[in-house]
UniProtKB/Swiss-Prot annotation:
Family of this protein: Belongs to the UPF0310 family.
Source taxon at top rank: Bacteria
Source lineage: Bacteria, Bacillati, Bacillota, Bacilli, Lactobacillales
Family annotation (Pfam families): EVE (PF01878)
Annotated SUPFAM superfamilies: PUA domain-like
InterPro entries recorded: EVE_domain, PUA-like_sf, UPF0310
Record organism: Streptococcus gordonii (strain Challis / ATCC 35105 / BCRC 15272 / CH1 / DL1 / V288)
Name this protein carries in UniProt: UPF0310 protein SGO_1818
HAMAP family xref list: UPF0310
Amino acid sequence: MTRFWIGVVSKEHVLRGVEGGFCQVCHGKKAPLNRMKKGDYLLYYSPKYQMNDQEKLQAFTAVGKILDDTAYQVEMFEDFFPFRRDVSYYQPVKDCPIEQIRQHPQWRQYASQLRYGHFEVSKDFFLYVFDQMKVDRSRNN
């Protein structure tokens, strides 16, 4: 059964993932990535442009489909070895400001979970956000 997820990541880091064809959540932890399976979908929500910046973005910034079954580890820096999953991202997409999503009936349920960094959402909510990003859903299915 296909599941739908949100990952909370700065836009700067989202763009690295889109460019490299991977996802990484919760500062590179393996456990959240292992909850996703091949064929699942991931929406990225970016509260900020850069992780340590104060400037807010508060928008959904990328959407993709998980391509593999297992997380793998990479060396980003000498002492940082995060886990990743391979993703096929839908492109082009445009950022979807959170204001456009707040009217969805399930928004309140999910808004409080953003602080966890990675969580499952309903197909209905996923498709609602997806449509707001004006993505051609026929690609990558």
